[in-house]
Design a protein with these regions (language model features):
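Carbohydrate-interacting/catalytic domains
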Residues: 1-155
Length: 155
């Protein structure tokens, strides 16, 4: 059928043997990353649903930015799609999609690294494959009366 996906040669349906023991010995295993991502997914109700996906603008097509939100749980992901090169971009957030006002600056906690940044509407990111291929941010609403620092933190 014209325009349909061909399953026979589709990479996503192929089984590929992985030498997990060798990857562990060589320090190239992705098992800890997969384990961490599964832990993050279980901890965030926003990641349990399929229909709450919102994309945000990046000025580099090699990076993708999207968020998922359920109630007060907001997760923002920025990922490098280039497995070979470091990529940089300015991310422009659709603040209302995050449940925020356009002018707000909020703490975002990277669930992969443990680091916290303050992000506003526009933010600079630099992601290196093999070291920091993505950010998985938990967007934290500041408590009432907390000072707003403003500005975008580099990551």
């Amino acid at each position: 059928r014209d325009g349909s996906e061909e399953y026979l040669d589709s990479e996503k349906y192929q089984l590929k043997p992985r030498d997990w023991a060798r990857a562990e010995r060589e320090g190239t295993t992705i098992a800890p990353l997969i384990t961490r991502l599964n832990t993050i997914r279980r901890a965030h109700p926003a990641l349990h649903r399929l229909r709450n996906l919102r994309f945000h603008h990046t000025d580099n097509d090699a990076l993708i930015a999207y968020s998922k939100r359920v109630g007060s749980d907001v997760v923002l992901v920025v990922a490098n799609l280039d497995p070979h090169r470091t990529q940089e971009a300015t991310i422009s957030l659709d603040m209302p999609q995050l449940g925020l006002d356009w002018h707000e600056s909020v703490p975002v906690h990277d669930e992969l690294t443990g680091r916290t940044y303050h992000w506003g509407r526009t933010n600079y990111v630099r992601l290196e494959p093999g070291r920091a291929p993505a950010h998985v941010f938990h967007v934290r609403r500041p408590s009432a009366g907390a000072p707003q620092n403003g500005g975008a933190g580099a990551s």
